């Protein structure tokens, strides 16, 4: 009987704790963003703030914050995935067309596919999966001025008119 009572007490306690997390001001979408951010930052410990600055941020269960992985790339399509996604030419090749409309469409396709992959993981309860976040390190916006630089193909070239 004691075990059953303890089980129910723990269940009710956990539901109450979850309800408290859901009612925190930083989770209230009706509040201004600045208020929500200040509330969240005030609740985070120094250790939690440091952990959130890593590319793989662990979950913070006491605040209901899921794990998140900030590292992903979509230079010419969503990278590092086993799913079938669209792969476009390198940025310098796309830039050579001078077709900014096509570049916009490629960006839209890439972002839609990235969002779909993230949503699949979210529905499956997988948070913090490597290379499956919504943060993409792309494009490389530097002007390619020196051929000795090894990342020139990741840029839109040396033409300032096109690159802006």
Predicted regions and their residues:
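N-terminal beta-rich core of secreted/periplasmic extracellular enzymes
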Residues: 20-164
């Amino acid at each position: 009987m004691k075990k059953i009572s303890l089980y129910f007490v723990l269940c009710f306690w956990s539901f109450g704790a979850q309800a408290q997390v859901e009612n925190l001001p930083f989770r209230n979408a009706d509040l201004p963003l600045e208020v929500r951010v200040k509330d969240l930052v005030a609740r985070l410990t120094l250790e939690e703030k440091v952990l959130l600055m890593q590319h793989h941020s662990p979950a913070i269960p006491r605040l209901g914050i899921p794990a998140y992985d900030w590292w992903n790339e979509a230079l010419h399509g969503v990278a590092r995935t086993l799913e079938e996604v669209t792969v476009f030419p390198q940025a310098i090749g796309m830039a050579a067309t001078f077709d900014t409309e096509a570049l916009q469409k490629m960006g839209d396709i890439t972002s839609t596919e990235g969002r779909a992959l993230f949503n699949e993981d979210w529905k499956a309860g997988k948070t913090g999966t490597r290379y499956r976040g919504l943060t993409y390190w792309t494009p490389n916006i530097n002007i390619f001025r020196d051929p000795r630089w090894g990342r020139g193909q990741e840029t839109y070239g040396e033409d300032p008119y096109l690159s802006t």
